[in-house]
Amino acid sequence: MAIVQTLPVPLEPAPEAATAPQAPVMGSVSSLISGRPCPGGPAPPRHHGPPGPTFFRQQDGLLRGGYEAQEPLCPAVPPRKAVPVTSFTYINEDFRTESPPSPSSDVEDAREQRAHNAHLRGPPPKLIPVSGKLEKNMEKILIRPTAFKPVLPKPRGAPSLPSFMGPRATGLSGSQGSLTQLFGGPASSSSSSSSSSAADKPLAFSGWASGCPSGTLSDSGRNSLSSLPTYSTGGAEPTTSSPGGHLPSHGSGRGALPGPARGVPTGPSHSDSGRSSSSKSTGSLGGRVAGGLLGSGTRASPDSSSCGERSPPPPPPPPSDEALLHCVLEGKLRDREAELQQLRDSLDENEATMCQAYEERQRHWQREREALREDCAAQAQRAQRAQQLLQLQVFQLQQEKRQLQDDFAQLLQEREQLERRCATLEREQRELGPRLEETKWEVCQKSGEISLLKQQLKESQAELVQKGSELVALRVALREARATLRVSEGRARGLQEAARARELELEACSQELQRHRQEAEQLREKAGQLDAEAAGLREPPVPPATADPFLLAESDEAKVQRAAAGVGGSLRAQVERLRVELQRERRRGEEQRDSFEGERLAWQAEKEQVIRYQKQLQHNYIQMYRRNRQLEQELQQLSLELEARELADLGLAEQAPCICLEEITATEI
């Protein structure tokens, strides 16, 4: 629900009200309804745009939610120029003097103004978001609607006020519109009955619009003006009955309406609520009407109680003060009831919007509360983690502090030990001073000896270099001898292989010779046989004759014998030839045997010579190696002696290194 705040409005016109700009006033519940243009300015076009953000005002006067100020639905009414206050008014186009104000209305106006100012000084009332239920126990503060901003009334099936009243009746306020209900009919009647009953009621507001302020109509004024009777061409006005009695009417065809009084402000009227403004204006105007009627006395006539009469009623007697006051109070009561009904209707109309806004605001507060709660929880967790981290750091720093204290104590102990040791070393240094001088003299002597030994060492190194060069030359000679030995050994192996081949050939020749001997024996035996046969056949041969037919018939034996004699001659020639070859082979074998034996003897001599040379080289190498080892041992011994002397001079002892000697034994190839 929206929080209602009212602003004070003085009854008397302020001197600066005509020049100072009017600040925008916060609208009431009914002023939130869009679509009602201001009568003071041009009617805005009807459009359904997105509603502006609603804002709420708490009792402390602070705006919550970060919403900006809402733009007013209607532009502010410019200040009206001050109208000179006159002491006369026009009622039914007749000049009337100013009627005396009603004492009861002035007292009530003053009391309501004081109550209104006291209410403005206090905190604004609280509205709960429940339909039709207002908060109780609010220190007895009445909840009243704020002044509505100038808007045009919505058409509700009845013609508007300017259609009845003409161009001069456009400035009627809510309180002046309520006079129509006061003099035209009861407020509780429906719109249909009021329109039908007021169809024949002529209205003539001649001097009314000129004396009215050019302010704005409140909600109750709009509702009152919407219930005006329609214009009728008939001359009679129906009389309506009210609970309090008859309402007077002035004239036979026109309603008498009083003019403005001296105390009415001429600027724009911003009342606290439609109810209070209409009550005050109705009371004051009622008193003035009563004064005007009593003053004139000739134009006032009561309405007829019969609604069906069309003829003008006779002029009534002048009404009394009590009747007028009773009518005024009844009009006030009807205005209050109408305003209360209007407020209830407006609250019912805006209930959904206000409840939705309140729920949205409540959800926004819940979201803010959840966000704040989460932020608080996160901050608490961060603070807890930071506290734990700080505690851990404090614990680590305490441990480091204890460790540093232990290290400091240990360093102090080490410092004391080092100080004691330094004192001991200083004492020993003072004691060893004379001995150091003696040691210096000995070192000088030893340095001279060392220089001599170094000179001897250089000489021995030169000899060693010479011996090394000789050793290198011997090694080169040894390599050459070994190469020659390898060559001679190769040659010997070749000769041995050749000798073996010759021996094999000799054996083969001997075997062949033996075979030839056996063949020769066989041939000898055959030759003996052939000799014997030849001896038997040495008879002189018969010279061949002419072909004897008897030779053709020679036997086979003769043919064999004659062939054997030819074969024996050929065999003898072959045997002789073989004998010559055998002798020649024997001579060649003997020559080869002699050459083989000579080569074997030469190879044996060369072998013995190489072996002797190799043994001599090996012996020389062994002697050189031994001499080198001996020289190395001497050099090492000298260096050890020098080092021992130096260490002895410095007062240190060192173990002598163990020297391992190798044994070299000669081997026979």
Swiss-Prot record:
Chain spans, region Sufficient for interaction with CTNNB1: 447-669
Coiled coil regions in record: 328-649
Sufficient for interaction with KATNB1 and for inhibition of katanin-mediated microtubule severing: region residues: 450-669
Tissues showing expression: Highly expressed in prostate and testis, and at slightly lower levels in spleen, thymus, uterus, small intestine and colon.
Any matching Pfam family: Fez1
Bias type Pro residues, positions: 311-320
Residue list for modification Phosphoserine: 249, 296, 570
Chain intervals with Low complexity compositional bias: 1-25, 187-199, 241-251, 267-283
Function text: Negative regulator of katanin-mediated microtubule severing and release from the centrosome. Required for central spindle formation and the completion of cytokinesis. May negatively regulate axonal outgrowth by preventing the formation of microtubule bundles that are necessary for transport within the elongating axon. Negative regulator of the Wnt signaling pathway. Represses beta-catenin-mediated transcriptional activation by promoting the nuclear exclusion of beta-catenin.
Protein's name according to its UniProt entry: Leucine zipper putative tumor suppressor 2
Gene: LZTS2
